[in-house]
Amino acid sequence: MNKNFIESNLNKQELSFEVPLRPQCLTDFVGQDSIRDRLEVHIGAARQRGEVLGHCLFSGPPGLGKTTLASILSKAMESNLVLTSGPVIEKAGDLAGILTSLKTGDVLFIDEIHRLNRSVEEYLYQAMEDFALDLMIDSGPNARSIQVKLNQFTLAGATTRLGLLSEPLRSRFAFTCRLEYYDPMILQKILLRTSRILNVKIDSEAALEIAKRSRGTPRVANHLLRWVRDFAQIKANNYIDLSVANRALTMLSIDEKGLDEMDKKMLQTMIDHYSGGPVGINAIAASIGEEPSTVEEVYEPYLILQGLLKRTPRGREVTSLGYQHIVGSSQR
Protein backbone atom coordinates (compact mmCIF):
# COMPACT_ATOMS: atom_id res chain seq x y z
CA MET A 1 0.00 0.00 0.00
CA ASN A 2 1.24 3.49 -0.84
CA LYS A 3 2.91 4.99 2.23
CA ASN A 4 2.95 8.48 0.73
CA PHE A 5 -0.80 8.86 0.20
CA ILE A 6 -0.94 12.47 1.39
CA GLU A 7 1.95 13.73 -0.73
CA SER A 8 0.79 11.79 -3.79
CA ASN A 9 -2.59 13.52 -3.62
CA LEU A 10 -1.44 17.04 -2.70
CA ASN A 11 1.53 17.27 -5.07
CA LYS A 12 -0.13 16.41 -8.37
CA GLN A 13 -2.25 17.92 -11.08
CA GLU A 14 -5.99 17.66 -10.80
CA LEU A 15 -7.33 14.39 -12.22
CA SER A 16 -10.29 14.22 -14.58
CA PHE A 17 -12.53 12.62 -11.95
CA GLU A 18 -12.14 15.72 -9.75
CA VAL A 19 -13.57 18.15 -12.30
CA PRO A 20 -17.28 17.26 -11.81
CA LEU A 21 -16.74 17.43 -8.03
CA ARG A 22 -15.66 21.07 -8.20
CA PRO A 23 -18.26 23.62 -7.02
CA GLN A 24 -19.53 25.71 -9.93
CA CYS A 25 -20.56 28.84 -7.99
CA LEU A 26 -19.92 30.54 -4.65
CA THR A 27 -23.21 29.18 -3.26
CA ASP A 28 -21.86 25.63 -3.68
CA PHE A 29 -18.46 26.53 -2.20
CA VAL A 30 -18.78 25.20 1.36
CA GLY A 31 -16.49 26.60 4.06
CA GLN A 32 -14.16 29.63 3.95
CA ASP A 33 -17.24 31.77 4.68
CA SER A 34 -15.48 35.12 5.04
CA ILE A 35 -13.64 34.66 1.74
CA ARG A 36 -16.86 33.66 0.00
CA ASP A 37 -18.66 36.73 1.37
CA ARG A 38 -15.86 39.07 0.27
CA LEU A 39 -15.76 37.52 -3.20
CA GLU A 40 -19.52 38.00 -3.58
CA VAL A 41 -18.99 41.74 -3.03
CA HIS A 42 -15.90 41.86 -5.28
CA ILE A 43 -17.68 40.06 -8.13
CA GLY A 44 -21.04 41.78 -7.67
CA ALA A 45 -19.55 45.27 -7.73
CA ALA A 46 -17.53 44.57 -10.88
CA ARG A 47 -20.57 43.14 -12.65
CA GLN A 48 -22.78 46.10 -11.70
CA ARG A 49 -20.20 48.57 -13.01
CA GLY A 50 -19.59 46.51 -16.14
CA GLU A 51 -15.88 46.33 -15.36
CA VAL A 52 -13.30 43.58 -15.56
CA LEU A 53 -12.82 41.93 -12.17
CA GLY A 54 -9.82 43.14 -10.16
CA HIS A 55 -6.82 40.81 -9.87
CA CYS A 56 -7.10 38.15 -7.12
CA LEU A 57 -4.43 36.35 -5.08
CA PHE A 58 -5.24 33.13 -3.21
CA SER A 59 -2.73 31.70 -0.74
CA GLY A 60 -2.73 28.72 1.59
CA PRO A 61 -1.77 25.03 1.76
CA PRO A 62 -2.40 22.80 -1.27
CA GLY A 63 -5.79 21.21 -1.87
CA LEU A 64 -8.00 23.84 -0.21
CA GLY A 65 -9.73 25.24 -3.30
CA LYS A 66 -7.56 27.92 -4.92
CA THR A 67 -8.06 26.54 -8.44
CA THR A 68 -11.76 26.05 -7.73
CA LEU A 69 -12.15 29.70 -6.75
CA ALA A 70 -10.46 30.81 -9.97
CA SER A 71 -12.92 28.66 -11.92
CA ILE A 72 -15.83 30.16 -9.98
CA LEU A 73 -14.56 33.68 -10.79
CA SER A 74 -14.54 32.99 -14.52
CA LYS A 75 -18.03 31.50 -14.46
CA ALA A 76 -19.40 34.39 -12.39
CA MET A 77 -17.92 36.89 -14.86
CA GLU A 78 -19.05 34.77 -17.84
CA SER A 79 -15.52 34.61 -19.18
CA ASN A 80 -12.89 32.02 -20.12
CA LEU A 81 -10.46 30.47 -17.63
CA VAL A 82 -6.87 30.07 -18.87
CA LEU A 83 -4.68 27.83 -16.70
CA THR A 84 -0.89 27.89 -16.36
CA SER A 85 1.76 27.80 -13.63
CA GLY A 86 4.79 29.81 -12.59
CA PRO A 87 7.48 27.25 -13.58
CA VAL A 88 6.00 26.89 -17.10
CA ILE A 89 6.49 30.59 -17.92
CA GLU A 90 10.26 30.58 -18.36
CA LYS A 91 10.81 33.80 -20.33
CA ALA A 92 9.08 37.03 -21.27
CA GLY A 93 8.11 35.62 -24.66
CA ASP A 94 6.15 32.82 -22.97
CA LEU A 95 4.22 35.37 -20.92
CA ALA A 96 3.61 37.59 -23.94
CA GLY A 97 2.20 34.65 -25.87
CA ILE A 98 -0.29 33.89 -23.11
CA LEU A 99 -1.31 37.50 -22.45
CA THR A 100 -1.82 38.45 -26.10
CA SER A 101 -4.17 35.48 -26.57
CA LEU A 102 -6.52 36.58 -23.77
CA LYS A 103 -9.90 38.05 -24.59
CA THR A 104 -11.46 40.92 -22.62
CA GLY A 105 -12.56 39.69 -19.19
CA ASP A 106 -10.70 36.37 -19.34
CA VAL A 107 -9.33 34.99 -16.07
CA LEU A 108 -5.67 33.95 -16.23
CA PHE A 109 -4.89 31.53 -13.40
CA ILE A 110 -1.20 31.20 -12.53
CA ASP A 111 -0.62 28.41 -10.04
CA GLU A 112 2.59 28.49 -7.97
CA ILE A 113 2.93 32.14 -8.89
CA HIS A 114 5.75 32.47 -6.35
CA ARG A 115 7.90 30.38 -8.72
CA LEU A 116 7.76 32.91 -11.55
CA ASN A 117 11.14 33.94 -12.90
CA ARG A 118 11.89 37.45 -11.55
CA SER A 119 12.59 38.85 -15.01
CA VAL A 120 9.22 37.52 -16.21
CA GLU A 121 7.51 38.89 -13.11
CA GLU A 122 8.64 42.43 -13.95
CA TYR A 123 6.80 42.26 -17.28
CA LEU A 124 3.70 41.18 -15.40
CA TYR A 125 3.63 44.44 -13.38
CA GLN A 126 2.85 46.56 -16.43
CA ALA A 127 0.41 43.99 -17.79
CA MET A 128 -1.56 44.01 -14.53
CA GLU A 129 -1.62 47.81 -14.16
CA ASP A 130 -1.74 49.18 -17.70
CA PHE A 131 -2.80 46.13 -19.74
CA ALA A 132 0.24 46.62 -21.94
CA LEU A 133 3.64 45.02 -22.54
CA ASP A 134 6.89 46.76 -23.52
CA LEU A 135 8.95 44.21 -25.45
CA MET A 136 12.48 44.48 -26.82
CA ILE A 137 12.88 43.59 -30.49
CA ASP A 138 16.26 42.51 -31.92
CA SER A 139 19.51 43.15 -30.05
CA GLY A 140 22.61 45.30 -30.16
CA PRO A 141 22.41 48.52 -32.22
CA ASN A 142 19.14 47.34 -33.82
CA ALA A 143 17.37 46.84 -30.49
CA ARG A 144 14.16 48.75 -30.03
CA SER A 145 11.18 48.67 -27.72
CA ILE A 146 7.60 48.23 -28.85
CA GLN A 147 4.46 48.43 -26.73
CA VAL A 148 1.80 45.78 -27.16
CA LYS A 149 -1.70 46.66 -25.97
CA LEU A 150 -3.55 43.86 -24.17
CA ASN A 151 -7.21 43.14 -23.66
CA GLN A 152 -8.24 43.80 -20.06
CA PHE A 153 -8.06 40.56 -18.07
CA THR A 154 -8.16 39.28 -14.50
CA LEU A 155 -5.07 37.63 -13.05
CA ALA A 156 -5.84 35.00 -10.41
CA GLY A 157 -2.66 33.90 -8.67
CA ALA A 158 -2.29 30.95 -6.32
CA THR A 159 0.57 30.29 -3.94
CA THR A 160 1.46 28.03 -1.05
CA ARG A 161 4.37 30.34 -0.15
CA LEU A 162 3.04 33.89 0.14
CA GLY A 163 6.27 35.09 1.74
CA LEU A 164 8.19 34.31 -1.45
CA LEU A 165 6.14 36.79 -3.50
CA SER A 166 7.81 40.14 -4.06
CA GLU A 167 6.08 43.19 -2.60
CA PRO A 168 5.66 44.88 -6.02
CA LEU A 169 3.72 41.86 -7.30
CA ARG A 170 1.70 41.34 -4.13
CA SER A 171 0.62 44.99 -4.04
CA ARG A 172 -0.92 44.82 -7.51
CA PHE A 173 -3.70 42.43 -6.47
CA ALA A 174 -7.03 44.07 -5.66
CA PHE A 175 -8.24 41.04 -3.68
CA THR A 176 -6.05 38.85 -1.48
CA CYS A 177 -7.01 36.07 0.91
CA ARG A 178 -5.61 33.04 2.66
CA LEU A 179 -7.53 29.77 2.63
CA GLU A 180 -7.43 27.88 5.93
CA TYR A 181 -7.83 24.20 6.75
CA TYR A 182 -11.46 23.02 6.90
CA ASP A 183 -13.37 21.92 9.99
CA PRO A 184 -14.32 18.18 9.97
CA MET A 185 -18.03 19.06 9.98
CA ILE A 186 -17.58 21.15 6.83
CA LEU A 187 -15.57 18.36 5.20
CA GLN A 188 -18.38 15.96 6.09
CA LYS A 189 -20.78 18.13 4.06
CA ILE A 190 -18.33 18.14 1.16
CA LEU A 191 -18.01 14.35 1.32
CA LEU A 192 -21.77 13.82 1.39
CA ARG A 193 -22.07 16.08 -1.68
CA THR A 194 -19.30 14.11 -3.41
CA SER A 195 -20.96 10.81 -2.53
CA ARG A 196 -24.16 11.96 -4.24
CA ILE A 197 -22.26 12.96 -7.38
CA LEU A 198 -20.34 9.64 -7.45
CA ASN A 199 -23.41 7.62 -6.40
CA VAL A 200 -21.63 6.26 -3.31
CA LYS A 201 -23.72 4.83 -0.48
CA ILE A 202 -22.34 6.15 2.80
CA ASP A 203 -23.79 7.07 6.18
CA SER A 204 -23.08 10.38 7.90
CA GLU A 205 -21.02 8.78 10.68
CA ALA A 206 -18.65 7.21 8.16
CA ALA A 207 -18.40 10.49 6.24
CA LEU A 208 -17.43 12.30 9.45
CA GLU A 209 -14.73 9.71 10.21
CA ILE A 210 -13.22 10.15 6.76
CA ALA A 211 -13.42 13.93 7.25
CA LYS A 212 -11.51 13.72 10.54
CA ARG A 213 -8.65 11.92 8.79
CA SER A 214 -8.50 14.25 5.80
CA ARG A 215 -6.06 16.85 7.19
CA GLY A 216 -8.67 19.58 6.86
CA THR A 217 -8.28 19.34 3.07
CA PRO A 218 -11.12 18.73 0.57
CA ARG A 219 -8.82 17.20 -2.04
CA VAL A 220 -7.55 14.63 0.46
CA ALA A 221 -11.11 13.97 1.65
CA ASN A 222 -12.36 13.27 -1.87
CA HIS A 223 -9.45 10.96 -2.63
CA LEU A 224 -9.99 9.09 0.63
CA LEU A 225 -13.66 8.68 -0.23
CA ARG A 226 -12.71 7.15 -3.57
CA TRP A 227 -10.41 4.68 -1.81
CA VAL A 228 -13.04 3.77 0.78
CA ARG A 229 -15.59 3.37 -2.03
CA ASP A 230 -13.27 0.88 -3.77
CA PHE A 231 -12.72 -0.96 -0.49
CA ALA A 232 -16.48 -1.16 0.13
CA GLN A 233 -17.06 -2.45 -3.40
CA ILE A 234 -14.75 -5.42 -2.80
CA LYS A 235 -15.17 -6.00 0.94
CA ALA A 236 -18.55 -4.61 2.04
CA ASN A 237 -21.25 -4.89 -0.64
CA ASN A 238 -20.84 -1.27 -1.79
CA TYR A 239 -22.05 0.29 1.47
CA ILE A 240 -19.84 2.46 3.69
CA ASP A 241 -20.58 2.57 7.40
CA LEU A 242 -18.22 3.55 10.23
CA SER A 243 -16.70 0.08 10.50
CA VAL A 244 -15.99 -0.12 6.77
CA ALA A 245 -14.47 3.37 6.76
CA ASN A 246 -12.18 2.51 9.67
CA ARG A 247 -11.00 -0.73 8.04
CA ALA A 248 -10.31 0.99 4.73
CA LEU A 249 -8.39 3.87 6.31
CA THR A 250 -6.40 1.50 8.51
CA MET A 251 -5.26 -0.30 5.35
CA LEU A 252 -3.86 3.06 4.15
CA SER A 253 -2.08 3.54 7.51
CA ILE A 254 -3.85 6.85 8.05
CA ASP A 255 -4.45 7.38 11.76
CA GLU A 256 -7.18 9.20 13.66
CA LYS A 257 -5.41 12.56 13.27
CA GLY A 258 -4.99 12.15 9.52
CA LEU A 259 -1.26 11.36 9.71
CA ASP A 260 0.11 8.88 7.19
CA GLU A 261 3.35 6.90 7.31
CA MET A 262 5.50 9.78 6.07
CA ASP A 263 4.16 12.19 8.71
CA LYS A 264 4.98 9.68 11.42
CA LYS A 265 8.35 8.89 9.87
CA MET A 266 9.23 12.58 9.97
CA LEU A 267 8.37 12.92 13.66
CA GLN A 268 10.01 9.59 14.53
CA THR A 269 13.20 10.54 12.70
CA MET A 270 13.39 13.87 14.51
CA ILE A 271 12.99 12.08 17.84
CA ASP A 272 15.43 9.24 17.10
CA HIS A 273 18.20 11.15 15.31
CA TYR A 274 17.89 14.72 16.59
CA SER A 275 16.45 14.24 20.09
CA GLY A 276 13.26 15.92 18.92
CA GLY A 277 15.05 19.03 17.66
CA PRO A 278 15.61 21.81 17.07
CA VAL A 279 16.70 20.73 13.60
CA GLY A 280 16.83 22.50 10.24
CA ILE A 281 14.39 21.79 7.42
CA ASN A 282 17.15 20.60 5.06
CA ALA A 283 18.35 18.03 7.58
CA ILE A 284 14.80 16.76 8.10
CA ALA A 285 14.21 16.49 4.35
CA ALA A 286 17.48 14.63 3.76
CA SER A 287 16.72 12.22 6.61
CA ILE A 288 13.33 11.19 5.23
CA GLY A 289 14.22 11.35 1.53
CA GLU A 290 11.99 14.29 0.60
CA GLU A 291 12.52 17.71 -0.94
CA PRO A 292 12.66 20.59 1.59
CA SER A 293 9.81 22.32 -0.28
CA THR A 294 7.62 19.22 0.10
CA VAL A 295 8.31 19.08 3.83
CA GLU A 296 7.48 22.79 4.19
CA GLU A 297 4.37 22.81 2.00
CA VAL A 298 2.80 19.37 2.52
CA TYR A 299 3.77 17.94 5.90
CA GLU A 300 4.87 20.74 8.21
CA PRO A 301 1.78 23.03 8.14
CA TYR A 302 -0.60 20.28 9.24
CA LEU A 303 1.75 18.93 11.92
CA ILE A 304 2.04 22.46 13.33
CA LEU A 305 -1.74 22.91 13.19
CA GLN A 306 -2.19 19.69 15.16
CA GLY A 307 0.31 20.88 17.78
CA LEU A 308 2.72 18.03 17.03
CA LEU A 309 5.52 20.23 15.69
CA LYS A 310 6.67 23.79 16.27
CA ARG A 311 9.01 26.25 14.61
CA THR A 312 11.66 27.99 16.66
CA PRO A 313 14.47 30.42 15.70
CA ARG A 314 16.86 27.44 15.86
CA GLY A 315 14.77 25.02 13.80
CA ARG A 316 11.83 22.61 14.09
CA GLU A 317 11.00 20.79 17.32
CA VAL A 318 8.66 17.91 18.14
CA THR A 319 6.22 19.03 20.85
CA SER A 320 5.16 17.03 23.89
CA LEU A 321 1.94 16.19 22.01
CA GLY A 322 4.08 14.97 19.12
CA TYR A 323 6.04 12.69 21.45
CA GLN A 324 2.82 11.33 22.94
CA HIS A 325 1.31 10.66 19.53
CA ILE A 326 4.37 8.81 18.20
CA VAL A 327 4.78 6.76 21.39
CA GLY A 328 1.08 5.94 21.38
CA SER A 329 1.17 4.93 17.70
CA SER A 330 4.14 2.62 18.25
CA GLN A 331 2.35 0.87 21.12
CA ARG A 332 -0.82 0.20 19.13
UniProtKB/Swiss-Prot annotation:
Gene3D superfamilies cross-referenced by the UniProt entry: 1.10.8.60, P-loop containing nucleotide triphosphate hydrolases (3.40.50.300), Winged helix-like DNA-binding domain superfamily/Winged helix DNA-binding domain (1.10.10.10)
GO CC annotations on file: cytoplasm; Holliday junction resolvase complex
Head domain (RuvB-H): annotated segments: 256-332
Binding-site list for ATP: 21-22, 63, 66-68, 129-131, 172, 182, 219
Entry GO MF terms: ATP binding; ATP hydrolysis activity; four-way junction DNA binding; four-way junction helicase activity
Protein's UniProt keywords contain Cytoplasm: yes
Reaction it catalyzes: ATP + H2O = ADP + phosphate + H(+)
EC number: 3.6.4.-
One of the Pfam families matching this protein, by short name: AAA_lid_4
Cell compartment(s), UniProt: Cytoplasm
Class of this enzyme: hydrolase
Entry's Gene Ontology BP terms: DNA recombination; DNA repair
Signal peptide coordinates: none
Residues that hold Mg(2+) according to the record: 67
Region (Small ATPAse domain (RuvB-S)) location: 183-253
Region named Large ATPase domain (RuvB-L): 1-182
Keyword field contains Chloroplast: no
Keywords: ATP-binding, Cytoplasm, DNA damage, DNA recombination, DNA repair, DNA-binding, Hydrolase, Nucleotide-binding
Subunit structure: Homohexamer. Forms an RuvA(8)-RuvB(12)-Holliday junction (HJ) complex. HJ DNA is sandwiched between 2 RuvA tetramers; dsDNA enters through RuvA and exits via RuvB. An RuvB hexamer assembles on each DNA strand where it exits the tetramer. Each RuvB hexamer is contacted by two RuvA subunits (via domain III) on 2 adjacent RuvB subunits; this complex drives branch migration. In the full resolvosome a probable DNA-RuvA(4)-RuvB(12)-RuvC(2) complex forms which resolves the HJ.
The family this protein is said to belong to: Belongs to the RuvB family.
Protein name: Holliday junction branch migration complex subunit RuvB
Organism listed in the record: Protochlamydia amoebophila (strain UWE25)
Lineage of origin: Bacteria, Pseudomonadati, Chlamydiota, Chlamydiia, Parachlamydiales
